[in-house]
Amino acid sequence: MDPCECSKTGTCNCGGSCTCKNCSCTTCNKSCCPCCPSGCPKCASGCVCKGKTCDTSCCQ
């Protein structure tokens, strides 16, 4: 389950490791928020995101 509350509030904070604003990831260490690169439907569980995107190898 995705802990991100973006769909409800537009913002989320995932255990301190991930912060979203307006449903876009601003800082992220885990794939708890939609910070995948364009064309990537979701990042693999436990994927480390760098900046606003994760590595394409994390795509699933």
From Swiss-Prot:
List residues traversing the bilayer: none
The entry's a divalent metal cation 6-binding residues are C36, C40, C43, C59
Q: Which amino acids does the record list as binding a divalent metal cation 5? A: C33, C35, C36, C49
Quick one: which residues bind a divalent metal cation 4? C32, C33, C43, C47
InterPro entries registered for this protein in UniProt = Metalthion_dom_sf, Metalthion_dom_sf_vert, Metalthion_vert, Metalthion_vert_metal_BS
Locate the region Beta.
1-28
- Residue numbers of N-acetylmethionine PTMs: M1
- Work out whether the entry's keyword set contains Transport: no
Amino-acid positions noted as binding a divalent metal cation 3 in the UniProt annotation, renumbered to this chain = C14, C18, C23, C28
Quick one: which residues bind a divalent metal cation 2?
C6, C12, C14, C25
Region Alpha, as annotated, extends over 29-60
Q: What domain of life?
A: Eukaryota
Q: Which residues bind a divalent metal cation 7?
A: C49, C54, C58, C59
Pfam families in the record = Metallothio
**Presence of the UniProt keyword Ribonucleoprotein in the record:** no
Annotated GO MF terms: metal ion binding
Q: Which residues bind a divalent metal cation 1?
A: C4, C6, C20, C23
* Keywords carried by this UniProt record: Acetylation, Copper, Metal-binding, Metal-thiolate cluster
Share the domain note from the entry: Class I metallothioneins contain 2 metal-binding domains: four divalent ions are chelated within cluster A of the alpha domain and are coordinated via cysteinyl thiolate bridges to 11 cysteine ligands. Cluster B, the corresponding region within the beta domain, can ligate three divalent ions to 9 cysteines.
The role this protein plays is: Metallothioneins have a high content of cysteine residues that bind various heavy metals.
Stated family: Belongs to the metallothionein superfamily. Type 1 family.
Q: List the protein's name.
A: Metallothionein
Q: Which organism is it from?
A: Pleuronectes platessa (European plaice)
Which lineage is the organism of this entry classified under, starting from the top rank? Eukaryota, Metazoa, Chordata, Craniata, Vertebrata
